Structures are given as structure tokens and as C-alpha cells.
Amino acid sequence: MDKNLLIAFKEYSALKHKQPYFYSIESSGQVLYYFGAEHKKDPRHPQFELLQEKWKEFLQKTFGGKSIVVFEGSVNINKETTLDEAIQKYGESGAIVFMGEKAHIVSTRPEPTIKDEADRLLREFSRDEIFYFYIVRGVVSWQRSLVRKEFDEFVRQNIKRYKEALEWSDFDFSFETVKKVHQQIFGKKFDLDDRDFISKIPNPTYDESRINEIARMSSTIRNMAILDCIESYWQKGYSIFVVYGASHAVMQEPAIKSLMSQEVSAKIAS
């Protein structure tokens, strides 16, 4: 795989594409399906019908072979969970992990740990900025949820998660830090009701502040980890069903499709 083909954000920002965004490759009995989703947690959203159609198609093409699901984020479902419940809690990732479990296909999350990613981000950004990015990114996800905890409870759990993962000494892991950084960057108080503005803050395709730069660096780190995972399983003979956000799908497409050209080159060389 030629990872240099990963599309840069400057180039990506000039592109227009559908959501969801889907493509596939097939070679020598292996299949790779990439479903680039719109981040939604409403089971009635039409993308989930399309996702189920593509999943059934994938199962038919790969019956009897080695397969794996590659998904975004953290998902924790049990045997009592329904598809609708999985979507309401985890969106498209919950849907594909649920369907994978029903088909007895293993799912994997290929991303670096929070600490590993943060250590790389610290080369260019402050702890305040990185913590703010992580918490506000979580707030945006919370705002998209149809079924959600009370905000104070969500924030408490999210802050606890990052405090345990980051292990920073002498750092104020609190929402007061988020409010302070927000005021410093934007010159105004944090307003939970200003949803449109908040949604842009951790979005890598915007240029509102340095936090968007963190988002871009984070996304690039994650993209490389995803490509490494896909390449590894492909070389081991697995068929792969990937479900990630549409931007990841679009940006990774040239690199993923280079798997095919490399196989052709290898056959010619042999």
C-alpha cells in the first residue's frame, strides 16, 4: 500500500462527495468494502438500510473465508442489545459491530491509544489545548445522540476517562479548564446551546482556531493507523469490511486502491 497517496486536508476540503460514501475492491477471493458513514445515531436514517444491504452483500461474497470488521470509536454491546439500541448509542460503529457479532465475525478498532496519540500531539500543542479538543469532541458526539446521559454526568465520565488515559501530573482535569481555554481562544463563554459553533471547533475541515489543527493532526495519526491495520489484514488473506466517517473513506481511498496496483505489479514481477 502506498500511504503517500493519503489525501491531505487542503486537497480534501476542495472535494465534494456523497454521504455515505462507499467503494470496494476485490482480488483473488478477497473483498474489501469501505462504508464511509455520516455520523448519525438515528436508526431511521436511510444510511443504515444501505449499510445492511452492503453487509449482506459482503457476507454472500465472503462466505467460508476469513473476514474481519474494522470500525471507528469505542463500542460495548452485549447479547441483549438490539440493532436499534446499538445505533442509538454508537451510531454506524454500533451497527456494524452488532451485525458482525451476529455473523460471528471479529471486529477490531485499529486506532492508537489516547496516550500514544496525545504524546504525538504534545510535540506541537499544549496540554490545555489537547484536553480541550478531546472534551469538546465528546460534547459534539453527545449532542448528536438521541438517547443520552445528563450533560453533567456525561462530562464527569468523559473527563475521568481522559484523566486516567493521559496520566498528566499537575493538570486540572475539569470542565473549568475547558471553559477557561474556550474563553482564551474565542473570547467568549462556552455556550452549550451554540451547537453550530461547537460542532466546528473539533472538525478538521474548518479553520476556526488551533483546535482545528489538532483535529487534523489527530485525524492523520488515526488515518495512518487505519491504513496499517487494513494493509496487515489484507496481506494475511482477510476480507475486510470497514466502517468509518466519510472523510476517512475519501481520504484513504487512493492509498487503499493502491493495494490492487501493487498486486498487479507483484504478479508481473513473478
Please provide the spans of the model-predicted regions.
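Membrane-embedded segments
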Residues: 45-63
